[in-house]
Amino acid sequence: KGTVYGVDIQPEMLELLKKNLDQLGIKNVKGVLGSIQDPKLPPNSIDLALMVDVYHEFSHPYEMLQNICSGLKPGGRIAFVEYRMEDPNVPIKLLHKMSQLQVMKEATPHPLEWVETITALPRQHIIVFKKTSATPVTR
């Protein structure tokens, strides 16, 4: 039940998604062609934005997070899944890791409130925020 939006900035990845969904008979996933600043989500439409090992790659993180927040329903959640910078034993280059503090600083100007950090994964943390009714800071 519900709709899942699969967002990518590469049309070929959305074509692959569609092919896989068609083969599996999955009907509730919609591919969305986003941009480097905007995931192009319908306003106030999503309960959860899940970003797995991607946020650190954004060239325009402020704008992207602002637009993700616009797509979230009030009380909706954002989950950042990123390799733990705090753990030197995680065999990933530093530029592909984020600390919890970094993620929290990125979220601060936006209408987001920290909910929890889940450390159950062996190399990544899941840092969860919920959308508040506050207005984001504009740059």
What is each model feature region?
Residues 37-49:
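A short acidic, Gly/Pro-enriched loop at the edge of an enzyme's catalytic core
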Residues 17-18:
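Conserved SAM-binding loop
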Residues 110, 114-139:
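Core SAM-dependent methyltransferase catalytic element
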Residues 10-11:
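Conserved SAM/SAH-binding beta-strand->alpha-helix loop
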Residues 62-77:
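A short glycine-rich, Lys/Arg-flanked "PGG" loop and its adjoining helix->strand segment in the class I
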Residues 47-62:
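A short SAM/SAH-binding and catalytic strip from SAM-dependent methyltransferases
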Residues 24-37:
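Conserved SAM-binding strand-loop segment of SAM-dependent methyltransferases
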Residues 14, 77-104:
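Conserved class I S-adenosyl-L-methionine
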